[in-house]
Amino acid sequence: MSQQVIIFDTTLRDGEQALQASLSAKEKLQIALALERMGVDVMEVGFPVSSPGDFESVQTIARTIKNSRVCALARCVEKDIDVAAQALKVADAFRIHTFIATSPMHIATKLRSTLDEVIERAVYMVKRARNYTDDVEFSCEDAGRTPVDDLARVVEAAINAGARTINIPDTVGYTMPFEFAGIISGLYERVPNIDKAIISVHTHDDLGIAVGNSLAAVHAGARQVEGAMNGIGERAGNCALEEVIMAIKVRKDIMNVHTNINHHEIWRTSQTVSQICNMPIPANKAIVGSGAFAHSSGIHQDGVLKNRENYEIMTPESIGLNQIQLNLTSRSGRAAVKHRMEEMGYKDTDYNIDHLYDAFLKLADKKGQVFDYDLEALAFINKQQEEPEHFRLDYFSVQSGSSDIATASVKLACGEEIKAEAANGNGPVDAIYQAINRITGYDVELVKYDLNAKGQGKDALGQVDIVVNHHGRRFHGVGLATDIVESSAKAMVHVLNNIWRAAEVEKELQRKAQNKENNKETV
């Protein structure tokens, strides 16, 4: 009987480090819910000691997620571990993941310490974490460049201290697959108490072999794989979980292991992460790229038509990609839209049917037929923008031409007040942004602008993703419309609402901190 490989997702911790703009607490929760639906065993959702905002988001996710184990990261520092436990304690069960560097280079130049001191510190911190939970994971940072004998000493001591998962990271993506397999095998040979812990791996893609390293480690005995959806992460990224999961499934004949992942949710989870994180998936990306199941060669097309297995080792349906696209019209009722969303795998909690149906009718009136990809895009945008809005686009008009300076007039609802402004700009989008900035008085600098078609043909929806810099912080906004200028305006309004909400959250955190201080003084 095959053994289970535990899937540990770090999209919301290590993966987020690659983003140009930090995710809001609501966006993180959306991703966490998608990961739970896909069936990840463990999700690492943040580094609570790093900021009050991260603490709050970890706490919110820990309170909400029920079917996956929620985990938080902590250095081998007392405060880190205590704060992580404080954020996680609202969960029924949780994991604390603590780490310290073990390679000679890191010990000498970063920690300015010795291996013996590192072991002593690791043991103390694992024991401290065990005071809060039985589920403690310990990582040997830069394990890939740590001599195996040294690594074995650290691992044995951490297990004796109470760590139930030992993670072996290739922190800088340096190790080759055969080397990494050798490290795992070497630990099994050298560590007498290794049967008391799960051996985990965490690989990076600097040399393009993160997935290969993880699979080689599993073949050598590792039983947990850490990674991120779509491989997002620092530098060249993390191990792409969807690739590991499907490799284990497709090649079960030689891997002889399995995961508990609902692989039919892979495609939708991948899309959720891509859209929320504003990181488009390359067309040639394995498993989830738009070209992953495309066949352009005549020979291949003929072979697939005769038997799909001639050129397909897995099906689009196996990852939840339904290739049958149905269309709805403005005559389709609310029940028909809801039924189609259910057929595509969406639950009632994934969208607001009232908001979705209103947006559907507006789009159907414009383009006649609404396809599955239109519905999914509308559902995503409405989910992103369902929170109370301080700013709302009331009206806009643009005049521009090949030789004229673009002029825009904009009306914006700011709370209960309607404000209007006009401005010139270098093109219609810039003119609208100048007018909006005049209305709000927000000092924002546009640092990224992306336009992607959601669908096919001249009436396809255009999704605009922007990133702006505001007082040293970056914020992401998204807009969707059949008109590019309108979607650009909506994206800017979305950004401004995100900035406004972030300021409100900051005020609330400051209020709580002040109340805490006042209570201390009273006592």
UniProtKB/Swiss-Prot annotation:
Q: Catalyzes what?
A: 3-methyl-2-oxobutanoate + acetyl-CoA + H2O = (2S)-2-isopropylmalate + CoA + H(+)
What top-level class of enzyme does the UniProt entry assign? transferase
Where is it localised? Cytoplasm
The UniProt entry's GO CC annotations, sorted and at most eight, read: cytosol
Select a single GO molecular function from the record's annotations and give it.
Answer: acetyl-CoA C-acetyltransferase activity
Q: Which cofactor does it need?
A: Mn(2+)
Report residue spans for region: Regulatory domain: 392-523
**Any stretches that span the bilayer, and where are they?**
none
Q: Which UniProt keywords apply?
A: Amino-acid biosynthesis, Branched-chain amino acid biosynthesis, Cytoplasm, Leucine biosynthesis, Manganese, Metal-binding, Transferase
Q: Where is the major localization of this protein?
A: cytoplasm
One GO BP: L-leucine biosynthetic process
The organism sits in which domain of life? Bacteria
Please verify whether the record's keywords include Metal-binding.
yes
Read off the Pfam families from this record.
Answer: HCS_D2, HMGL-like, LeuA_dimer
CDD domains referenced in this protein's UniProt entry, alphabetically: DRE_TIM_IPMS
Give the Enzyme Commission number: 2.3.3.13
Positions binding Mn(2+) in this chain are D14, H202, H204, N238
- Job description of the protein: Catalyzes the condensation of the acetyl group of acetyl-CoA with 3-methyl-2-oxobutanoate (2-ketoisovalerate) to form 3-carboxy-3-hydroxy-4-methylpentanoate (2-isopropylmalate).
Provide the family line.
Belongs to the alpha-IPM synthase/homocitrate synthase family. LeuA type 1 subfamily.
Task: Fill in the subunit field for this protein.
Answer: Homodimer.
| UniProt name for this protein | 2-isopropylmalate synthase
Q: Which gene encodes it?
A: leuA
